[in-house]
Protein backbone atom coordinates (compact mmCIF):
# COMPACT_ATOMS: atom_id res chain seq x y z
CA UNK A 1 0.00 0.00 0.00
CA UNK A 2 1.27 3.48 -0.85
CA UNK A 3 2.11 5.81 2.03
CA UNK A 4 -0.29 8.80 2.04
CA UNK A 5 2.55 11.03 3.29
CA UNK A 6 5.48 10.26 0.96
CA UNK A 7 3.86 7.92 -1.64
CA UNK A 8 6.46 5.23 -0.97
CA UNK A 9 5.25 1.73 -1.81
CA UNK A 10 6.79 -0.09 1.18
CA UNK A 11 4.61 -0.13 4.30
CA UNK A 12 4.20 -2.70 7.03
CA UNK A 13 1.19 -3.66 9.10
CA UNK A 14 1.75 -2.97 12.79
CA UNK A 15 -1.67 -3.99 14.12
CA UNK A 16 -4.88 -5.56 12.74
CA UNK A 17 -8.27 -5.79 14.46
CA UNK A 18 -11.78 -6.69 13.52
CA UNK A 19 -14.29 -3.84 13.77
CA UNK A 20 -17.94 -3.31 12.77
CA UNK A 21 -19.03 -6.67 14.21
CA UNK A 22 -16.35 -8.50 12.27
CA UNK A 23 -17.33 -7.09 8.88
CA UNK A 24 -14.29 -4.84 8.61
CA UNK A 25 -10.57 -5.03 9.40
CA UNK A 26 -8.79 -2.00 10.83
CA UNK A 27 -5.06 -2.01 10.08
CA UNK A 28 -2.44 0.27 11.59
CA UNK A 29 0.43 0.69 9.11
CA UNK A 30 3.85 2.29 9.15
CA UNK A 31 5.79 3.56 6.15
CA UNK A 32 9.25 2.01 5.91
CA UNK A 33 10.65 5.12 4.19
CA UNK A 34 9.34 8.06 6.26
CA UNK A 35 8.19 6.13 9.40
CA UNK A 36 4.78 7.87 9.42
CA UNK A 37 1.85 5.81 10.69
CA UNK A 38 -1.64 5.66 9.24
CA UNK A 39 -4.82 3.60 9.52
CA UNK A 40 -6.63 1.70 6.77
CA UNK A 41 -9.97 -0.10 6.79
CA UNK A 42 -10.62 -3.20 4.73
CA UNK A 43 -14.08 -4.50 3.81
CA UNK A 44 -15.24 -7.23 1.47
CA UNK A 45 -16.65 -6.04 -1.83
CA UNK A 46 -20.05 -7.69 -2.03
CA UNK A 47 -21.41 -7.71 -5.56
CA UNK A 48 -25.13 -8.13 -6.00
CA UNK A 49 -26.37 -10.15 -8.99
CA UNK A 50 -28.06 -8.43 -11.93
CA UNK A 51 -31.85 -8.69 -12.13
CA UNK A 52 -33.61 -10.34 -15.07
CA UNK A 53 -36.92 -8.53 -15.45
CA UNK A 54 -40.07 -10.35 -16.60
CA UNK A 55 -39.70 -8.74 -20.07
CA UNK A 56 -36.17 -10.19 -20.37
CA UNK A 57 -34.31 -6.93 -19.76
CA UNK A 58 -31.37 -7.03 -17.37
CA UNK A 59 -30.59 -4.27 -14.92
CA UNK A 60 -28.45 -3.77 -11.82
CA UNK A 61 -29.98 -4.75 -8.48
CA UNK A 62 -31.65 -1.64 -7.03
CA UNK A 63 -31.77 -1.88 -3.25
CA UNK A 64 -33.72 1.38 -2.98
CA UNK A 65 -36.48 -0.05 -5.18
CA UNK A 66 -36.74 -3.17 -3.02
CA UNK A 67 -36.67 -1.16 0.22
CA UNK A 68 -39.37 1.18 -1.14
CA UNK A 69 -41.69 -1.75 -1.83
CA UNK A 70 -41.10 -3.20 1.62
CA UNK A 71 -41.67 0.17 3.31
CA UNK A 72 -44.91 0.76 1.37
CA UNK A 73 -46.20 -2.65 2.46
CA UNK A 74 -45.23 -1.95 6.09
CA UNK A 75 -46.59 1.60 6.17
CA UNK A 76 -48.38 2.28 9.50
CA UNK A 77 -47.68 -1.26 10.70
CA UNK A 78 -46.12 -1.98 14.13
CA UNK A 79 -42.76 -3.26 12.86
CA UNK A 80 -39.46 -1.90 14.20
CA UNK A 81 -36.85 -0.32 11.94
CA UNK A 82 -34.34 -2.90 13.20
CA UNK A 83 -36.60 -5.75 12.07
CA UNK A 84 -36.95 -4.17 8.64
CA UNK A 85 -33.17 -3.71 8.31
CA UNK A 86 -32.61 -7.33 9.33
CA UNK A 87 -35.13 -8.53 6.74
CA UNK A 88 -33.42 -6.47 4.02
CA UNK A 89 -30.03 -7.88 5.02
CA UNK A 90 -31.44 -11.41 4.92
CA UNK A 91 -32.82 -10.90 1.41
CA UNK A 92 -29.51 -9.51 0.15
CA UNK A 93 -27.58 -12.36 1.79
CA UNK A 94 -29.88 -14.94 0.20
CA UNK A 95 -29.40 -13.33 -3.22
CA UNK A 96 -25.61 -13.34 -2.87
CA UNK A 97 -25.69 -16.93 -1.55
CA UNK A 98 -27.19 -18.14 -4.84
CA UNK A 99 -23.77 -17.59 -6.39
CA UNK A 100 -25.51 -16.52 -9.60
CA UNK A 101 -24.48 -13.48 -11.62
CA UNK A 102 -28.12 -12.91 -12.61
CA UNK A 103 -31.37 -13.69 -10.81
CA UNK A 104 -34.98 -13.38 -12.01
CA UNK A 105 -37.02 -10.55 -10.50
CA UNK A 106 -39.56 -13.20 -9.41
CA UNK A 107 -36.95 -14.64 -7.04
CA UNK A 108 -36.50 -11.25 -5.38
CA UNK A 109 -40.26 -10.79 -5.09
CA UNK A 110 -40.63 -14.22 -3.48
CA UNK A 111 -37.78 -13.52 -1.02
CA UNK A 112 -39.45 -10.22 -0.07
CA UNK A 113 -42.78 -11.99 0.45
CA UNK A 114 -41.13 -14.65 2.62
CA UNK A 115 -39.62 -11.97 4.86
CA UNK A 116 -42.85 -9.95 5.02
CA UNK A 117 -44.78 -13.09 5.96
CA UNK A 118 -42.48 -13.41 8.99
CA UNK A 119 -42.63 -9.70 9.88
CA UNK A 120 -46.30 -8.82 9.44
CA UNK A 121 -49.14 -10.74 7.78
CA UNK A 122 -51.02 -7.57 6.75
CA UNK A 123 -47.91 -6.18 5.05
CA UNK A 124 -47.47 -9.54 3.33
CA UNK A 125 -51.02 -9.37 1.91
CA UNK A 126 -50.48 -5.74 0.82
CA UNK A 127 -47.29 -6.66 -1.02
CA UNK A 128 -48.72 -9.86 -2.50
CA UNK A 129 -51.80 -8.03 -3.81
CA UNK A 130 -49.62 -5.70 -5.88
CA UNK A 131 -46.88 -8.20 -6.73
CA UNK A 132 -49.31 -10.88 -7.88
CA UNK A 133 -51.78 -8.36 -9.37
CA UNK A 134 -54.89 -9.52 -7.53
CA UNK A 135 -57.95 -8.85 -9.70
CA UNK A 136 -60.77 -9.29 -7.18
CA UNK A 137 -61.65 -9.94 -3.55
CA UNK A 138 -61.66 -13.71 -4.13
CA UNK A 139 -57.90 -13.69 -4.75
CA UNK A 140 -57.37 -11.79 -1.49
CA UNK A 141 -59.45 -14.41 0.32
CA UNK A 142 -57.49 -17.28 -1.20
CA UNK A 143 -54.18 -15.73 -0.16
CA UNK A 144 -55.46 -15.10 3.37
CA UNK A 145 -56.65 -18.71 3.56
CA UNK A 146 -53.17 -19.90 2.53
CA UNK A 147 -51.69 -17.72 5.27
CA UNK A 148 -53.91 -19.30 7.90
CA UNK A 149 -52.86 -22.85 6.91
Curated annotation (Swiss-Prot):
GO terms, biological process: negative regulation of DNA-templated transcription
Keyword flag Zinc: yes
Residue ranges constituting the ATP-cone domain according to the UniProt record: 49-139
Keyword Cell division part of the UniProt annotation: no
Known cofactor(s): Zn(2+)
Details of cofactor binding: Binds 1 zinc ion.
Entry protein name: Transcriptional repressor NrdR
UniProt organism field: Vibrio parahaemolyticus serotype O3:K6 (strain RIMD 2210633)
Taxonomic classification: Bacteria, Pseudomonadati, Pseudomonadota, Gammaproteobacteria, Vibrionales
Gene from which this protein is expressed: nrdR
